[in-house]
Regions:
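N-linked glycosylation sites
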Residues: 18, 25, 120, 124-125, ...
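Short acidic/His/Gly/Ser-rich catalytic and metal-binding motifs that mark active-site loops
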Residues: 16-18, 67-71, 115-117, 154-159
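Conserved SGNH/GDSL esterase-like catalytic core that processes O-acyl groups on lipids
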Residues: 29-128
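Mobile gating loops/cap/lid regions near enzyme active sites that modulate substrate access
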Residues: 152-168, 187, 192-230
Length: 230
């Protein structure tokens, strides 16, 4: 069904949001301190962005999602046992009931859960699936596209000092993914408005200077259900 909204949309395909609450039949996350059933204690980045840009938020993201479930299956739940829609499926869902408009902004922020669920994948492999998703959006009419990268996997509070996350492949994954994302942004910049949110640089600054950001214990996790790499 076509959405009747006067404002341009901000559409988010990602691995966060409150979709886990839906796919878990309203059982996860169960901690009442999580705001609006998302993995946060308050409004999250996409809500702030939509408000700042005066865009109508359409958040299709689901915690635990990967870029393509045929490549790496995304999961959520207390034991990461519940399969979730990938960003490819999130895009297909949106395009089944709406079409891009000239002022709509599409944010595709994905790629971290692949290495969390499978330590043998590479950043370039994940990038190829992200590129397919962006091509789908572009061919459907999307002309404002934003991508984002992440902090280094081995510095996540839930993975810090975990033996399964110390391999050379894991440590190089985010740099390789970021190179691929920059290439995608550059390639499509000739045909659309594109941008990359450099979260990796920000998080590296936070890790190096946590006190400047008001962080006392940078490696303490608030959400501890991280899949174990065997």
């Amino acid at each position: 069904m076509k959405t009747e909204i006067s404002l341009p949309l901000a559409i988010f395909f990602s691995d966060n949001g409150n979709g886990s609450w839906v796919v878990s039949n309203a059982t996860w996350p169960s901690d009442p301190s999580y705001f609006a059933h998302s993995f946060s204690d308050g409004p999250v980045w996409n809500e702030h962005v939509a408000n700042a840009l005066h865009l109508e938020l359409v958040n299709i993201a689901t915690g635990g999602a990967t870029t393509n479930n045929g490549f790496v299956q995304g999961r959520t739940g207390p034991e990461s046992e519940i399969p979730v829609p990938s960003t490819a499926e999130q895009i297909a869902s949106f395009l089944s009931w709406d079409v891009p408009r000239p002022g709509d902004v599409f944010v595709h922020w994905s790629g971290v859960n692949e290495i969390l669920f499978n330590p043998n994948v590479t950043g370039s492999q994940t990038t190829s699936w992200i590129n397919e998703n962006i091509e789908t959006l572009y061919r459907a009419g999307a002309r404002n596209i934003v991508l984002g990268n992440y902090n280094d996997i081995e510095t996540f509070p839930g993975t810090y000092n975990a033996s399964g996350y110390q391999s050379d492949n894991v440590k190089s994954y985010m740099d390789d993914l970021s190179i691929g994302l920059r290439n995608i942004v550059g390639a499509y910049s000739a045909y659309a408005n594109t941008a990359l949110v450099e979260a990796q640089t920000l998080f590296r600054n936070i890790a190096a200077n946590p006190e400047e950001y008001g962080i006392d214990e940078k490696y303490n996790a608030t959400y501890s259900s991280i899949p174990t790499i065997q």
